[in-house]
């Protein structure tokens, strides 16, 4: 009986991603709700309380006798998080961002009309404890717009405002809230399919994290078939989930990724509750992070791409970082260096002398996944709702009507649909107009009474298409062993970024946590070394920017991520100084 009860609970819990039918009256009630309260994470989320303790521990550790200068390469969430926690630890971070705006993969900018274009449709979950703690630390929690606790799926070809949905009842803990919400729903999966899937997932619940980690080497589809779960379950449920998690299909995504997400969402009462930022992530999140860092003595610079990591070639400091060459032949140096760049960028900048080291050679197997983010401004309001919607579309992952869901983009005139186009591998090189046409064809299926691909119904007033050729790292089977730890074999070089080792995989939460871990690594290494005879590697003299150098005045357009331009050689005076330093160290 106990086993049967567990199987039923597992089936109903997994089916938390498989909603029932919701029609117009219920949706109207949902849209009317405003000002949904922040969930009480202090009460419902053990990970949130752990995140609070970890941040407090950084602040309470002994202050350095001499604050160290730490250069952080990259002004996305990982880099800004690193710098935020470094100033909390009493050090002096200098953030170097290649573009002229902060945010990296969450960057956003305004066009000539004042409308915002985002790199991606970014949502925050209750199961993002470190992100939630960051908002609390910055005193900007009111900028998160929480939505009704529901997971909503489109029903392609259906009438206006008809969705597959399930609501998590308030007042019940996880996973009971998911089970209660789902048991009555039979919209997408039959009971035999639910039970088959539930039985397949029992080991994950019985053996926990150890079992989850063991599934890293198989794809979602392989895992399902090995357990006799029908392909229809994968098609109806896990295509949408896989595309939302990593922008790829279940025949390539590692099952570990799905199991980690399920555990995070279903072990925390408010884990799957969604919030959207009330505007541009660059303005509403990254700028407050910058202000916090600078108010405590840190520095944040933009439009300063790194072109070479300069390393010592001889002596006791061999292979350690001597400084960085920036555009315009500017040279900067520090006590420690943290890379918070995307994985494809640090792969390009990795010095030749490091590439044979196992730490870096493994990392070379990681790669970013392509994704496209689309904004379409329509001439009228569409039948949408105030929440994120899983599209269940061939080409679209998720979408939201930002004129309804986001205060910063609200409009009473027309809808602005923001959509994630994924998988994008076959589309990333195509013209924007072709991508728009394909998107409109998908929207005609999702909004059959309101949109026609030929534009004969709702009219497109304008659109933007943001292509990111290498976004978050592609979570393929076998890639977990390639992910680098924060501490590297180079004594003054630390790694951050969502691809580095941390438990939240490729996500905003993962990026923020990686920054905290990188800052902690600097703090702990420096404290250990302060009580020993360890000497930090010698530093190159800093040199000013020279505007006459090739590409010195080049600026990356807003809609593009910076593509690393590796310097072919060092300026002669820098090369001479480095040679003198290394020769002296060899003799000494």
State each model region's role.
Residues 87-112:
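Glycine-rich FAD pyrophosphate-binding loop
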Residues 501-522:
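A conserved FAD-binding loop/helix module that cradles the flavin
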Residues 406-411, 467-495, 499-502:
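FAD-binding beta-loop-beta segment adjacent to the flavin cofactor pocket
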Residues 259-336, 340:
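Helical element adjacent to the flavin cofactor pocket in flavoenzyme catalytic cores
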Residues 131-132, 136-137, 141-259, 267:
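Mobile amphipathic helical/loop "lid" adjacent to a hydrophobic cofactor/ligand pocket
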Residues 67-95:
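N-terminal Rossmann-like FAD-binding beta1-loop-alpha1 element of flavoenzymes
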Residues 66, 89, 304-447, 562-565, ...:
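Mid-domain catalytic core of redox enzymes
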Residues 17-70, 88-89, 545, 549-587:
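Extreme N-terminal leader/targeting segments of oxidoreductases
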